[in-house]
From Swiss-Prot:
Protein name, entry field: V-type ATP synthase subunit F
Membership in a protein family: Belongs to the V-ATPase F subunit family.
Function recorded in the entry: Produces ATP from ADP in the presence of a proton gradient across the membrane.
GO biological process, alphabetically ordered: proton motive force-driven plasma membrane ATP synthesis
SUPFAM superfamilies assigned to the protein according to its UniProt record, in alphabetical order: AtpF-like (SSF159468)
GO MF term set: ATP binding; proton-transporting ATP synthase activity, rotational mechanism; proton-transporting ATPase activity, rotational mechanism
Highest rank taxon of the organism: Bacteria
InterPro entries: ATPase_V1-cplx_f_g_su, ATPase_V1-cplx_fsu_bac/arc, ATPase_V1_fsu_sf
Keyword annotations of the record: ATP synthesis, Hydrogen ion transport, Ion transport, Transport
């Protein structure tokens, strides 16, 4: 079993290119369907963590939600270079509330 799991980031080109310097695999997308297919492909090829920019995620909610119910991959929403939509923050808050029974954030 591979000790090191792969990490990828999906989003618009300007937002994801900086992650390449950190050694993270980057997958620039333009169209919603391209984003769906990319996330599905990453999930099927052993990526443990997939970061998705909020601006991309807002248009592919059903794909994001499908992976929320699974242990791996962890799909984590991040702000794009255009700023945040607070979707990722809200998801974390919801998950914490679900886990502990009260919103502590």
């Amino acid at each position: 079993m591979d000790m090191y799991k792969k990490i990828g980031v999906v989003g618009d080109k300007d937002s994801v290119l900086a992650f390449k310097a950190l050694g993270i695999d980057v997958f620039p997308v333009v169209e919603d369907e391209e984003a769906r297919k990319t996330i599905d492909k990453l999930a099927m090829t052993g990526y443990a963590v997939i970061f998705v920019t909020e601006h991309v995620a807002k248009n592919i909610e059903e794909t994001i939600e499908r992976y929320t119910r699974q242990v791996l991959p962890a799909v984590i929403l991040i702000p794009s270079n255009q700023g945040t939509l607070n979707i990722g923050k809200q998801r974390i808050s919801d998950n914490v509330e679900k886990a502990v029974g009260v919103n502590i954030l």
